[in-house]
Amino acid sequence: MAKYIFITGGVLSSLGKGITSASIASILEEMGYRVTLQKLDPYLNVDAGTMSPYQHGEVYVTEDGAETDLDLGHYERFTNAVMTRDNNVTAGRIYYNVISKERKGDYLGATVQVIPHITEEIKESIKRVEKDNDIVIVEIGGTVGDIEGLPFLEAVRQLSLELGRKNSMFIHLTYVPYIKAAGELKTKPTQHSVKELRAIGIQPDMIICRADRELPKGIKSKIALFTNVKEEAVISAPDLEFSYEVPLKLKEQGIDRIITERLNLEHREVNLGKWKKIVNVLRNPEEEVNVALVGKYVELKDSYKSVIEALIHGGIANKVKVNVILKNSEQLDISELQEDIHGIMVPGGFGERGIRGKIEALNFGRENNIPTFGICLGMQLMAIEFARNVLGFSNANSTEFDPDTPFPVIDIMEEQKKVDKLGGTMRLGAYPCKVKENTLAHRIYQKDLIYERHRHRYEFNNRYRKDFESKGVVFSGTSPDDKLVEIMELKNHMWYLGCQFHPEFKSKPFAPHPLFRDFIRACLEYKRKFT
């Protein structure tokens, strides 16, 4: 039977429960334990697929095609665990399942209630990820005290009781504000947050305190006294320059030993050498490169979380600092790309808004031999830009933006034409891609067949393949049956590549994705040669 760690949050949201959970998992993994993580989201959406990036940040796609919370990206980046649709459970899915069972008569006429029916469904969803794992870390989204989170807290309270004290523990992440006028850290919000948690029936075994500085011993002692937690289990989590420092900071305070003792696990040697190397490169880069990320959701950086992290990973591989400069495609002045920019990134997205600026950025990158990388919609816009400005198809477009375009170089996939629902209906998850020899893509991957994650409805229109190839475009990656274009690149360009898939979802700091690694290498080469 697996051991369970339940992680809750208090005082306010966006404290970093996802990174904290992932960091704890990485430490336990380094001890040789098989660890998985799960995110419980109390919102009523069935999944994150139809949510606005402004509301919720990016949608993270798993190998099996689930559209999930961005925290699953942290889980995969920090650990070796592979997430599936079972690793993200929403209140929407729980209620949907319960109501479906009621309609089928599975409850035999019983009055369906939050307790026991909703809580039992939550518990079953949690236990589903236990298979073949020694430890399951469950992050409960939201903040203690939120109405929508109560059934989830009740469910984990019940589950903890069923598992027994040696098989489960609670970690509460809270916030300790520094009041400038008073010149001191205040523990009262943490005290009240734990009081709220205890009123539900949950006593935390550890409190991780987020603050803008280190917690002095006196503050730790005070929190321990008023929350009924051992002082050694009050962990300081100050603001850090890099998120990849968090495992080191937690290990420094003995979190590994506290957890193994509490869960009656064998304590094993923890070697965080790989994290130290990563942090050392981030702190002491040999050079810097500037990459312009041109998108329409740039006001919220989390909208492009995995892309930004993957660019940083590419920097780690090349021992350079990557300055990701966010450019709003709706307000883009092309002269901004002339100012010390060494690479252009156009990530995925949906809808017509902001398209003009992205196409202008791609045109600038192509004509000025600047390393340029397009992902998903970014690749599709590369095709549109090329059709308009090189092939002379002035009205070329995607049928997503102009259903009546005379040159539909991007068209809806055949199997998508009869789909009338948005949620979970795209081409989602990992699919194979055949890589053509003697191409940039093959040099980067060093493989003939790769598997990458997808999230799209539209594709390159094969009717125009010969037109593109006649002018120097190479379709270096396709589906194994050669029907779907996966990668396109330019022959006579330093580095101009677009991919239909999302490579950012398979990049880790200690295993950077090959495309991002080589893109940053090209940016560095461009900087050395031309600036």
Swiss-Prot record:
Its EC number is 6.3.4.2. It catalyses: UTP + L-glutamine + ATP + H2O = CTP + L-glutamate + ADP + phosphate + 2 H(+); L-glutamine + H2O = L-glutamate + NH4(+); UTP + NH4(+) + ATP = CTP + ADP + phosphate + 2 H(+). Pathway: Pyrimidine metabolism; CTP biosynthesis via de novo pathway; CTP from UDP: step 2/2. The active site is at C376, H502, E504. InterPro entries: Class_I_gatase-like, CTP_synthase, CTP_synthase_N, GATASE, GATase1_CTP_Synthase, P-loop_NTPase. GO terms for molecular function: ATP binding; CTP synthase activity; glutaminase activity; identical protein binding; metal ion binding. HAMAP family: PyrG. This is CTP synthase. The lineage of its organism: Bacteria, Pseudomonadati, Aquificota, Aquificia, Aquificales.
